[in-house]
A protein has these predicted regions:
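Conserved RecA-like P-loop NTPase ATPase core
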Residues: 16, 68, 155
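A short acidic, often aromatic-flanked loop/helix-cap motif at beta-alpha or helix-coil junctions
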Residues: 1-4, 47, 92-95
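Internal, active-site/partner-interface "lid" segment
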Residues: 98, 110-150
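S-adenosyl-L-methionine/SAH cofactor-binding core of RNA-modifying enzymes
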Residues: 20-69, 75, 112
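Structured adenosyl-cofactor binding patch, chiefly the S-adenosyl-L-methionine
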Residues: 77-124
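SAM-dependent methyltransferases
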Residues: 139-201
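A short aromatic-anchored loop/beta-hairpin motif
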Residues: 2-5, 9-26
Length: 201
C-alpha cells in the first residue's frame, strides 16, 4: 500500500545513501491482513536461520514474512509490528524475497504429506547434525570415475559403515563447527577419532 503521495519509500533522516521503506504503508498492509499470525522480517540484522529455528517456525499456525528492500525499513515499524528478525546468511541480497523463499521451502518440506517419502527427512544434512557423504547413481562409470564398490556390494552393514565414515569425514573437513554439539554414538565417536588422527585438514 502506498501513501497519499504514491510512494512507499523516502530518504533517511540524518542523510545517507539509499532509500528507506516508510512505516505507514507497511503498517496499513499488515493491519489489512485478517490473520497475520507470527510476523517475521527478513533482515541482515536478524538471527541466522538454522534447522532448529525452521522447526520452531513450522509449529506456528500462521506466518507473515515481511521482505525488506532498499536500505531497510523504518525502525518504528519494526518495533511495532515485527515479532522476529531473521537472516539467511552473511551476504547481501537485493531484497528479502529470496530469503523468504528459502524459509517457505524449508518449512514446507517438514510438514507431513509434503514430501513423497517422509523418511528422507531423517537423514538430511543438519537434521542429523552431520553433512551427507557422497551419493551416486547410474551409470557405474562416468569420466573414468567408478561408483565405490561397497555401494554395489549389497552388504547393508558395510554400506552403512561407509556412509557414516564419509559423512563424518566431510563434516570434519567442511563444517567442523557442526561437531561441537552433535551427539554421536560410540561407533561414530571412534570413527571420528580415527579420522582426526589421519586427516590433515
Amino acid at each position: 500500500m502506498e501513501t497519499e503521495y504514491g510512494s512507499i519509500d523516502d530518504s533517511p533522516y540524518g542523510g545517507g545513501e539509499g532509500m528507506v521503506m516508510m512505516p505507514e504503508p507497511l503498517s496499513k498492509t499488515i493491519e489489512s491482513i485478517p490473520n497475520v499470525g507470527f510476523r517475521i522480517l527478513l533482515s541482515p540484522q536478524g538471527k541466522i536461520i538454522d534447522n532448529n529455528l525452521i522447526k520452531s517456525l513450522a509449529k506456528k499456525s500462521t506466518l507473515t514474512l515481511i521482505c525488506g528492500r532498499y536500505e531497510g525499513i523504518d525502525e518504528r515499524f519494526i518495533d511495532s509490528y515485527v515479532d522476529l528478525e531473521v537472516s539467511v546468511g552473511d551476504y547481501i541480497l537485493s531484497g528479502g524475497e529470496f530469503g523468504a523463499l528459502c524459509i517457505i521451502d524449508a518449512i514446507s518440506r517438514i510438514i507431513p504429506g509434503v514430501l513423497g517419502n517422509p523418511d528422507s527427512i531423517k537423514n538430511d544434512s543438519f537434521e542429523t547434525k552431520l553433512l551427507k557423504g557422497p551419493i551416486y547413481t547410474r551409470p557405474k562409470k562416468f569420466h573414468d570415475k567408478n561408483v565405490p564398490e561397497v555401494l554395489l556390494s549389497g552388504n547393508h552393514k558395510e554400506i552403512e559403515d561407509w556412509r557414516l565414515y564419509q559423512s563424518l569425514k566431510r563434516t570434519l573437513q567442511r563444517r567442523p563447527d557442526l561437531l561441537d554439539d552433535v551427539k554421536l554414538s560410540k561407533k561414530a565417536k571412534k570413527v571420528l577419532e580415527d579420522l582426526r588422527s589421519k586427516l590433515i585438514l
